[in-house]
Amino acid sequence: ADVPGNYPLDKNGNRYY
């Protein structure tokens, strides 16, 4: 996934804020 910054990913690979 394209992450504009340093967002951690949950186990599904989705970024959370």
From Swiss-Prot:
Name the UniProt record assigns to this protein: Mammal toxin PlMT
Phylogenetic classification of the source organism: Eukaryota, Metazoa, Ecdysozoa, Arthropoda, Chelicerata
Role, per record: Binds to sodium channels and affects the channel activation process. Has high toxic effect on mice but no effect on B.fusca and C.partellus larvae.
Subcellular localization, as worded in the UniProt entry: Secreted
Annotated tissue distribution: Expressed by the venom gland.
Signal peptide span: none
Keywords: Ion channel impairing toxin, Neurotoxin, Secreted, Toxin
Membership in a protein family: Belongs to the long (3 C-C) scorpion toxin superfamily. Sodium channel inhibitor family.
Gene Ontology molecular function, alphabetical: ion channel regulator activity; toxin activity
Source species: Parabuthus liosoma (African black tail scorpion)
Principal location listed in the UniProt entry: secreted
Top-level taxon in the UniProt lineage: Eukaryota
GO cellular component, one term: extracellular region
